[in-house]
């Protein structure tokens, strides 16, 4: 794991020294002194706009001209224009720096925060850059047995020079804790589905949350049957691995209302008898991304001992083919007593959520409930990989979630709810169907309305459809290909601000 230290003294044992310059390309007195120590290397570089313009995210790695000492490279990072610099952008810049250092095989780097950036205190800026680098250091290569030496290389340590190193270290410790929660979310999402069976996944939740003071209860199929969870059980009945409902409760402040987080945990989704195409079916190991975001959020909240009351409920199932699999046309009775005609077995996530959200409301009486799910391909068609979809029955709740997402660059786009969508899930033989009676119309909105049927009056509810953002087929500033860990930082930020 990347080692991060903060100092206000001399930088020691570093191979790469990083400085930050904006588009004005002006050196303050501190940078002028540093430039002189490096024989004008900084001023010469920024004088040539073909080499460096100060544009945000631009990274220039230059061999050092100093023959003595450890420093082999000078790294100049562009800040862009200061008025456009946000906390999220500073974090992403930290990630870019780490990735450039990794490519250049620089094992130790030092970040020198010596020029004044009026939008941030030096300690805030320092902690944000370090946080971004830490997030970008994540790897999932545990099953690679033939890694080349170049692929094994990783930056070992980052030293951050700032005038208030003690406060910067305190700020970073919180960000590091949240990043480690993101790493759990990425890890469990990236795991192959033959490894993370519902039982194994449930046990990992217990192992990580109980030491943090979270009560965890694993509910098996017999108890779920007694509770009347016909929708969730129907999804998993084709699998030889037993479905689980994992219930997590964190009590941090008795005076605060309970927030419920509910996650879809489809460990692997073949589509069932409504079989998916085989070309990208392997990616369905990520179909439990909503549940992973919920667990990661619980880790982040409990790890900080925040004064809030949070419950997490995740339904862990496999949607598999077998002689016992659910059939199109089956009717299931949900825990709420409402019946559902299953017209498409590949619209299974909403069935899992129907029972999970009802259970959360029945047991914990939350004021606010947020469900998170890789629910529909339609949301990816609508929003791509830039935004997740946000549906809500409460404008204030939606606004708070969207604001939290903007602050950590996990963006949400408000999507519509309308009675006409609700009318499209009618059934001739049950209370509702699990898909629209108008093919290919408003798929993500229909799915949201299905879940809304199971939200009780008076509960502030939001549904986050993260199907387009939960995993990525390209490297980002804050992580490699694969699971993104989307939702953990968003929900942690939202929960911190909810009662303010």
Curated annotation (Swiss-Prot):
Q: Which UniProt keywords apply?
A: Aminopeptidase, Cytoplasm, Hydrolase, Manganese, Metal-binding, Protease
Superkingdom: Bacteria
User: Which NCBIfam families does the UniProt record give?
Assistant: PRK00913.1-2, PRK00913.1-4, PRK00913.2-2, PRK00913.2-4
Q: Note whether Cell cycle occurs among the keywords.
A: no
Q: What is the lineage of its organism?
A: Bacteria, Pseudomonadati, Pseudomonadota, Alphaproteobacteria, Rickettsiales
InterPro entries on file: Leucine_aapep/pepB (IPR011356), Macro_dom-like (IPR043472), Peptidase_M17_C (IPR000819), Peptidase_M17_leu_NH2_pept (IPR023042), Peptidase_M17_N (IPR008283)
Kindly report the protein's main subcellular placement as a broad class.
cytoplasm
What protein name does the entry list? Answer: Probable cytosol aminopeptidase
Among the GO molecular function terms of this UniProt record, one is: manganese ion binding
Mention any one GO cellular component term assigned to this protein in its UniProt record: cytoplasm
Q: Which family does it belong to?
A: Belongs to the peptidase M17 family.
Cysteines joined through disulfide linkages: none
Q: What does this protein do?
A: Presumably involved in the processing and regular turnover of intracellular proteins. Catalyzes the removal of unsubstituted N-terminal amino acids from various peptides.
Q: Which catalytic residues are annotated? A: 276, 350
The EC number(s) given in the record are 3.4.11.1, 3.4.11.10
Query: What does the UniProt entry say about where the protein is found?
Result: Cytoplasm
Gene behind the chain: pepA
State the organism of origin. Rickettsia canadensis (strain McKiel)
Q: Which GO terms describe its biological process?
A: proteolysis
At which positions is Mn(2+) 2 bound?
A: 264, 269, 287, 348
- Top enzyme class of this protein? hydrolase
């Amino acid at each position: 794991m990347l080692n991060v230290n903060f100092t206000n003294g001399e930088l020691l044992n570093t191979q790469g020294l990083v400085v930050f310059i904006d588009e004005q390309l002006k050196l303050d007195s501190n940078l002028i002194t540093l430039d002189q120590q490096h024989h004008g290397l900084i001023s010469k570089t920024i004088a040539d706009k073909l080499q460096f313009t100060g544009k945000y995210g631009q990274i220039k790695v230059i061999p050092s001209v100093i023959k003595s000492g450890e420093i082999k490279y000078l790294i100049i990072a562009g800040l862009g224009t200061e008025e456009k610099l946000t906390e999220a952008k500073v974090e992403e810049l930290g990630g870019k720096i780490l990735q450039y250092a990794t490519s250049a095989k620089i094992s130790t780097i030092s970040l020198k925060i010596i020029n004044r950036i009026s939008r941030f205190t030096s300690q805030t800026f320092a902690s944000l850059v370090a946080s971004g680098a830490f997030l970008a250091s994540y790897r999932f290569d545990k099953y690679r047995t033939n890694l080349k030496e170049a692929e094994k290389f990783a930056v070992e340590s980052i030293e951050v020079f700032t005038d208030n190193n003690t406060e910067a270290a305190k700020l970073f410790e919180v960000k590091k804790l949240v990043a480690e929660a993101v790493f759990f979310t990425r890890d469990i999402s990236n795991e192959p589905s033959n490894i993370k069976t519902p039982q194994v996944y449930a046990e990992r939740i217990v192992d990580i949350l109980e030491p943090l003071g979270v009560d965890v209860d694993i509910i098996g199929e017999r108890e779920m049957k007694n509770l009347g969870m016909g929708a969730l059980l129907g999804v998993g009945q084709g699998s030889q691995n037993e479905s689980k409902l994992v219930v997590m409760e964190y009590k941090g402040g008795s005076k605060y209302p309970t927030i419920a987080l509910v996650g879809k945990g489809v460990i692997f989704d073949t589509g069932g008898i409504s079989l998916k195409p085989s070309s990208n079916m392997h990616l369905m190991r990520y179909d439990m991304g909503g549940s992973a975001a919920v667990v990661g959020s619980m880790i982040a909240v409990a790890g900080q001992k925040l004064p809030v009351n949070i419950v997490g409920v995740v339904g862990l199932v496999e949607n598999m083919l077998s002689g016992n699999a659910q059939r199109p046309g089956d009717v299931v009775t949900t825990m709420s007593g409402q019946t559902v005609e299953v017209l498409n077995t590949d619209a299974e996530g909403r069935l899992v959520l129907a029972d999970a959200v009802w259970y959360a409301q029945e047991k914990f009486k939350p004021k606010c409930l947020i469900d998170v799910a890789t629910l529909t391909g339609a949301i990816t068609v609508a929003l791509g990989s830039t935004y997740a979809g946000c549906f809500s029955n409460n404008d204030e709740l939606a606004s708070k979630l969207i604001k939290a997402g903007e602050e950590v660059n996990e963006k949400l786009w408000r999507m519509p709810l309308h009675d006409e969508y609700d009318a499209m899930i009618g059934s001739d033989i049950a209370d509702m169907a699990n898909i629209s009676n108008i093919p290919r119309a408003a798929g993500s909105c229909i799915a949201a309305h299905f879940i809304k049927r199971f939200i009780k009056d008076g509960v502030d509810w939001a549904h986050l459809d993260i199907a387009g953002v939960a995993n990525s087929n390209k490297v980002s500033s804050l992580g490699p290909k694969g699971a993104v860990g989307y939702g953990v930082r968003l929900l942690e930020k939202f929960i911190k601000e909810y009662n303010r």
